[in-house]
């Protein structure tokens, strides 16, 4: 059964002071779905999020929350449906973690902000869910960035929203806290069926955590679809105008620009034995060639990105004589051979012959292991 739609935009244009920056934005968010905005710095991701969160006025078009026009929702009514965590840091003085989390109950408390037993139970439940209960008596300002971000997530959950909007929630976090935070977010969307709309700079994480990706650049949405649809055919390189390297769609990581020129080193690799060496050679400014690899080999994406020349066979095909002759010709023009492989089988037997050919020719050979 298809999940209920929580939010959608219709012909939305956003900007500042009446000037349109991004036009005709059409996106939707369903229960239990994570939708992520990506794009270059200054593309307008935060502007879109702030407009959807009613912090900026729409220039044209509309935002609908469960088919109710955003303009018709009162502040407290919206706060019961939508919570936000933006990049601007809050600096509450002399407030404990529990105090900050409890601020999320403001849509439900009176003017004095007095918590009822139910409110206190929700605060405790949210701290437990985000695993910050042991910190509840700590001063918020004494926490690490990762801990603060978890507290702000718990505060947002205290509103008991259906929609959660996050602007670059992992920007200040190290890799451990990034993974922990996004894992919590993913678990929360599954269990509570909350819809999450956020922006991320980390493309590898966006690819892994998102159900849909919205690509923001220029005056329009450049692309909108599943990660499998967006992270394909070199689109990310085009979106970010990458020239000093390339985004590897299969791995979700980036490789720096290859060293040009005539290959000085020939690398015999495969089965993941060569990728670290390829990067080491690139760092040292040494142009190199690689062979023979299958195009399905784990080393192939890095080789294709960093090597001047790659002699490769089609995926799942045996290496043939033509591959051997092409590799031999390139290898013999190099000053050195580096062999990363220690095990040779039936498929890569021609790589063993290449190594033997290098020995017979008296070439300098280095056996390399990570």
What is the predicted function of each stretch?
Residues 102, 117-135:
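Conserved ABC ATPase "signature" region
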Residues 164-168:
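Catalytic Walker B motif of ABC-type/P-loop ATPase nucleotide-binding domains
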Residues 241-322, 339-352, 364-370:
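ABC ATPase nucleotide-binding domains
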Residues 160:
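Conserved catalytic motifs of ABC-family nucleotide-binding domains
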Residues 53:
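Helix-to-loop junction immediately C-terminal to a conserved catalytic motif
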Residues 61-69, 78:
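Conserved ABC transporter NBD signature motif
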Residues 38-40:
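The feature captures the beta-strand-to-loop junction immediately N-terminal to the Walker
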